[in-house]
Amino acid sequence: MILMVCRWNCTNPEYPMNSKIAATFLTGHLRHKIGDSRKLCVAFSGGLDSAVLLAGLAELRDTTLPQVELRALHIHHGLSQFADDWMAHCQAFCHQRNIPFSAVKVQVDAQDGGIEAAARTARYQVFAANLAENEILLTAQHLNDQCETFMLALKRGSGPAGLSAMSADSSVHGYRLLRPLLDLSREQLEEFAAQLQLSWIEDESNRDARFDRNFLRL
């Protein structure tokens, strides 16, 4: 497992952001994105994106919106030798921020459509089964993911309908799904993580060019 801990060099003139500015910007952005929603469940993998999302929502709850009911749901796919370590990291991350944490282990059947598609199907089945009434699911896809989605659609020869972008507010399997980070880049999330001194997991499979998204990145 690769565990990343990022701390910012505040003397670098190219990056004038400090921790207070980062927290204020992030919480303001998230408050706008969640609107009147108050029962929030974050799909928490422990990676950079979901770590920033979850930490930002916890900060929003603690400083501005105490009525927010925030929890984290981690999916243990069992596909990596480090899967147990990832789950333990996520649990500790949540404990540090007083966020209720739960994890669900799934069996990924990759016979039809490959590992990526099978893992995604398994995740969303868990989400549908575990969300409470009026609870909103939040996932942490960002601007780079949005661009990759478009490029993958082109690579696969999708028609106009298949080239549509991910929606920031949608409905999946009967529940509401918010993606509040879609207009922020990975570089911006790295800035937030640095200023907030977050630690996160780097999945070793992200460097495996056999997976379509990684092929575009490498």
Question: Which ranges hold each PLM region?
Answer:
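Core alpha/beta nucleotide-donor-binding catalytic domains of modification enzymes
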Residues: 15-218
